[in-house]
Amino acid sequence: MIQIHALPAFNDNYIWLLQDLSSQQCAVVDPGDAKPVLGWLAQNPDYRLTDILITHHHNDHVGGVAELKQSTAARVLGPAAETIPARDIALVDNDRMTVLGLEFVVHAVPGHTLGHIAFYHEDATTPLLFSGDTLFAAGCGRLFEGTPQQMHDSLGRLAKLPDSTLIYCAHEYTLSNLRFAQAVEPANVDIAERLAEVTRWRSENRISLPSNMALEKRTNPFLRTGETSVKEKADERSDAQNTSQSAVFASLRAWKDKF
């Protein structure tokens, strides 16, 4: 049985730790800081860190890799197209690997960075997606390297995953993302309900993750670029007629950058 824990890091990062109760092994995703992981291992001395999964090269996702590799000799898996510290296995689109007995498939999702990947575990009841900084709860990552078209295509690819997919993104941005979503779709009842719920959770110091794909399709404006109300708001903000969904996305992303 696998349990998934969020290890907070920095101001708003989450390092995801997968704990295999049967083998007493564990894996982590995007350890930007080694300390939270080493602290967990110290509190759970029977467990051994076997794998480190990396979605992209930004330091808040890889800053702890070298120290963890030195301390644990864990296998480091990351995107082939980016420079990843201590990487053992370079991954490209559609690669498959087994971690803690779970098979994951790699999805290339350029946009936030050009080599960004996501890890997807297909399961009949509970599919898992570790999306890094591509798909957030109610939002998406900034475009540091890629184009709006690339990010729109990447999000569209992820949106085709099953509605039941649990989404483990790397930051606690949900509240600010939902405030933006409400500005885009003020009449969207699902967004209003989710905003109220997440506001309550955060006031209780609870995390807002994981999300799920069905919820994202109802409340994430960056997955709703085909909705008439979203296009109209994007047109209004950009003072132009956005003639494609990727153009709507570009308008929304530019607005969010200044929101």
UniProtKB/Swiss-Prot annotation:
Residues that, per the record, bind Zn(2+) 1: H56, H58, H112, D133
Region named Disordered: 220-243
A Pfam family: Lactamase_B
GO biological process: methylglyoxal catabolic process to D-lactate via S-lactoyl-glutathione
Residue runs in coiled coils: none
Enzyme superclass (EC): hydrolase
HAMAP family according to UniProt: Glyoxalase_2 (MF_01374)
Family: Belongs to the metallo-beta-lactamase superfamily. Glyoxalase II family.
PANTHER family documented for this protein: HYDROXYACYLGLUTATHIONE HYDROLASE, HYDROXYACYLGLUTATHIONE HYDROLASE GLOB
SUBUNIT field: Monomer.
Name of this protein: Hydroxyacylglutathione hydrolase
